[in-house]
Curated annotation (Swiss-Prot):
Belongs to the Maf family. YhdE subfamily. One of its GO terms (biological process) is nucleotide metabolic process. It catalyses: dTTP + H2O = dTMP + diphosphate + H(+); UTP + H2O = UMP + diphosphate + H(+). Disulfide bonds: none annotated. Pfam families: Maf. This is dTTP/UTP pyrophosphatase. It is found in: Cytoplasm. InterPro entries: ITPase-like_fam, Maf-like. It is an enzyme of class 3 (hydrolase). The record marks 12, 74, 158 as: Important for substrate specificity. The keyword Hydrolase applies.
């Protein structure tokens, strides 16, 4: 069996991967996300970011055999504008206010790199999420929990912001940060059967 490495510091991704895989390593990527400019194609952008993360970790372990590195990047898009992690509370408020009462998309790019052969596969998942109308007080109370500050789009569906979600169309785990169904099919393509 190949050693599987998750190129992510995200606790959410680690928890999700543990649901389908008992044994894996974590090596945090030092990939500079700003090195890839956004050019209006969100699926391509998230796949390039995921590949950059996987290759960054792959370079660190080139001398080891039988390693597969999983890279992932998740972002929120609204009106074809990328909403990353908020810079501050004001930014978080503006993001949540924009999402209030509207539908947005959550994209995750996935990349799996076979370090020995240098073979890489990439794919993406898009999930549509509709928020109910939020009051300013709801948004402020949520921001004051600190929860939105490390999350794309300034919310985590698996936490207190779950009550904001009116409906979801697509993979729930994608919105959390790691689309398990797509990851499973990609691992199978790389010869790993869970």
């Amino acid at each position: 069996m190949k050693n599987i490495i998750l190129a992510s510091a995200s606790e959410r991704r680690q928890e999700l991967l543990k649901r389908i895989l008992e044994d894996f390593q974590i090596i945090v990527s030092d990939f500079d996300e700003s090195s890839i400019p956004f050019k209006d194609n969100i699926p391509s952008y998230v796949m390039n970011l995921a590949e950059g993360k996987a290759r960054s970790v792959g370079k660190k372990i080139m001398d080891q055999d039988s390693n597969l590195v999983i890279g992932c990047d998740t972002l929120v898009a609204f009106n074809n504008k990328v909403l990353g992690k908020p810079k501050d509370k004001k930014d978080a408020f503006e993001m949540l206010q924009a999402l209030s009462g509207n539908e947005h998309e959550v994209y995750s790019g996935l990349a799996i790199l076979d370090v020995k052969s240098n073979k890489i596969i990439t794919d993406f998942v898009c999930t549509k999420v509709k928020f109910s109308k939020l009051t300013s007080l709801q948004i402020e109370k949520y921001i004051n929990t600190g929860d939105p500050m490390d999350k794309a789009g300034a919310y985590g569906i698996q936490g207190k912001a779950g009550v904001f979600v009116e409906n979801i169309n697509g993979c729930y785990y994608n919105v959390v940060g790691l689309p398990l169904n797509k990851l499973n099919s990609m691992l199978m393509e790389m010869g790993v059967n869970l």
